[in-house]
A protein has these predicted regions:
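Non-catalytic, mobile gating and regulatory segments of ester bond hydrolases
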Residues: 1-230
């Protein structure tokens, strides 16, 4: 069976892929990180390695060695998808492809971009990449329910990037997608260093969350369906 597994951004949740997965022509699994959204009462991850190990354990219950596996990740989720892809291949799973959205390769990300002195700086960062209104950022709901997981994810992302040294290239197809107005991602061609195959790159109009725009959603769904059907 063909299965697409989706990983959200820092502080994100499975619902962020709601529009995207409606038209996908295969079985879809949307990961929900511990301590996020529907799993709010569970403990947050201590590190990226902790997150990846936990995802591996969960996926073993949902996929088989006979399945054709495709991994999709947005922003931090793209890094998780890439690391999981390597781990799954090493464990004997049939990983066919990665769809990496809005994320440069780890050696091109500056960990100092995630040096936040306080929560106000995190809010400014979110407003810059997502144009999130102040009414949301300053709400009690955001402060109590969303900010803790965002703060933690940005911390583990910073630590992961700062310590990253691997140059292992994955042996599966990689499709990179990002938006030309994304303030965090200039280009994604650097992923070629991490692939044993020729990568594909696609650029769209929009910001860091470009795949939420209907026109982009339709194009991405069409692209993924074509890739999966090959």
């Amino acid at each position: 069976m063909k299965k697409l597994i989706c990983f959200p951004c820092a502080g994100g949740n499975a619902k962020s892929f709601e529009k995207l997965i409606r038209g996908i022509h295969c079985f879809v699994i949307c990961a929900e990180y511990s301590g996020h959204w529907s799993r709010y009462e569970e403990p947050l991850y201590h590190s990226m390695e902790d997150c990846i190990q936990y995802q591996m354990q969960e996926l073993r219950e949902k996929i088989t060695l006979q399945d054709e596996i495709f991994l999709l990740g947005h922003s931090m989720g793209a890094l998780i998808a890439f690391e999981l892809g390597k781990n799954l291949l090493n464990a004997g799973y049939n990983v066919k492809g990665l769809y990496l959205l809005a994320c440069m390769p780890p050696d091109e990300i500056n960990d100092t971009d995630f040096n936040f002195e306080d929560d106000e700086e995190i809010k400014l960062f979110l407003k810059r990449i997502n144009q999130m209104p102040g009414s949301v950022l300053n709400s009690d709901f955001f402060r109590e329910n969303l900010l803790p997981s965002i703060r933690n994810d940005l911390r583990i992302l910073k630590n992961f990037i700062g310590a990253y040294s691997s140059r292992e290239a994955i042996d599966c197809n990689i499709v990179c997608m990002c938006a030309v107005q994304d303030p965090l991602v200039n280009e994604m061609c650097g992923w070629q260093r991490y692939s044993q195959r020729k990568i594909k790159e696609y650029y769209y109009q929009g910001n860091h969350f470009f795949f939420h725009e209907q026109e982009n959603t339709e194009k991405i769904v069409e692209l993924i369906n074509l890739e999966i059907s090959d």
